[in-house]
Amino acid sequence: MKKLMIRKRNQDGFTLTEMLATVLIMSIVTTSIVAGVSVVRDNFKNVQNKANAQVLLSTTVAELTDRFAFASEIKGGESSNPRFLLDIGGQWIVLKNSADGIVYQLCKAEDDPANFGKYIVTEDTSKAPALLVTKEAQAGLICYYDEYTYSSSGYFTIKNLRVYEKEGFDPSHPENSEVLAKLPEEYSIECLNGSLTPR
């Protein structure tokens, strides 16, 4: 019997206390890793959204500069969000905010501004508003502005151009959404054709 008892005491393995301590330590380590991964993932998403917002803002400014810089005439009587004529193709154009981002629309000088943002028939084709920056480039974000104006000194000024996350954005209350990127309050773009006289 003594031989049997000695054998049992010398058996390799864990006691119940050692096993429970090991399980407890492993569960604490696992919980820490899982929590850390979710925090890192959330931080990465925030950084990625801010970077995408800066890219969208830069792309939008480049597109706006392409449109504004080549204007050759301005529609008179519209101090805010005026229509302007592009040199390329001789088309009148108007910019507008929409639920999908900033859109531009080809129109005639005599078109009713109340129709902007809707389908308008011009000469032989129906022109729908088109996004200034494609949906793919927007990456779930939306660019929005308060207004743009034209001054007789030859500058278009866009006011409060900013980027929001599209999900949950309400255009009627933009102040309720987080701004991911923005330009200074007023950003001016020079018209390369000089000072245009409103028509």
Where are these regions (language model features)?
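Short, well-structured beta-strand/strand-turn elements
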Residues: 69-78
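Aliphatic-rich helix starts adjacent to a transmembrane/signal segment
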Residues: 2-4, 14-69
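Short coil/loop residues immediately preceding or within conserved phosphate-binding loops
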Residues: 11
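Type IV pilin-like appendage domain
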Residues: 77-157, 164-169, 175-178, 182, ...
